[in-house]
């Protein structure tokens, strides 16, 4: 590589073709019912961490899901007695993340699927563990009362604050249905755009039809999973809403790029306080900063190498 070309939104040859995108970060508090469930799940998780530490596994005080996933192979190969608490901890961590970012219904649907799968610790977790079983009981009680994530209550206010079309992104399939149903109940016309996998997935023909209907204004809001981030030709939207955060700078840019093409756009990012949302926010922020500085660093290295090459004389110049 002899040179690197870097472009940002402010580059002279790019700026004429883009519009400003105003970004708003909105923090919400989990409802008390969800906080109670969150506490129980963390207690259940801590029990597994204690067992893993007693078995000689080194864990940080605040253990991430990705860190747990990384030690799976080590446990299977060299510390088999830790397999059950580790895989149970991973299941609990997934459940906790889904609760925090997506809400009651998505959490319960995840638990329903996890319970019927065979695996180490499944029966103990769902039938014996007092904290986890209590968490599920509280979640079902909250669901029966119509309690969902606080983000849902914010959506109507956000969507109606900007006239025109809105695109809502969520990483989790189950929350697409929750968001769609709640918007419909609120009297907001909406459509769904999801991937092709699974029994409930949309085939490509249906995806294209959904996008076309959105473009023609048959509904005002499109709720999409990752399939809406790239590839499909979704028309210009006035507002993009991140229902959840993604720790990927590439996916952040792809989501954000759906607005602010022809006119000034708006991006709204919903963050639940003291949850995985905040963690992903900071991870994403660091990655964005790193990505912006990468081009400059590479250019400086290449310039330095070129200077060294130009200074070579004599025999060195031919080696």
Please annotate each region the language model reported:
Residues 3-15, 33-181, 185:
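Helicase motor interdomain insertion/brace
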Residues 12-17, 36-38, 200-201, 231-234, ...:
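Switch/connector loops and helix/strand junctions flanking conserved nucleotide-binding motifs
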Residues 1-3, 21-23, 188-189, 235-238, ...:
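Short glycine-/polar-rich loops that comprise or flank the Walker A/P-loop
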Residues 165-169, 175-226:
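Conserved helicase ATPase core of P-loop NTP-dependent helicases/translocases
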Residues 223, 230-245, 265-271:
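A short beta-strand element within the Helicase C-terminal
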Residues 289-319:
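Helicase-associated low-complexity regulatory tails and linkers flanking the ATPase motor
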Residues 210, 251-256:
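Short beta-alpha junctions and helix-cap segments that line functional grooves
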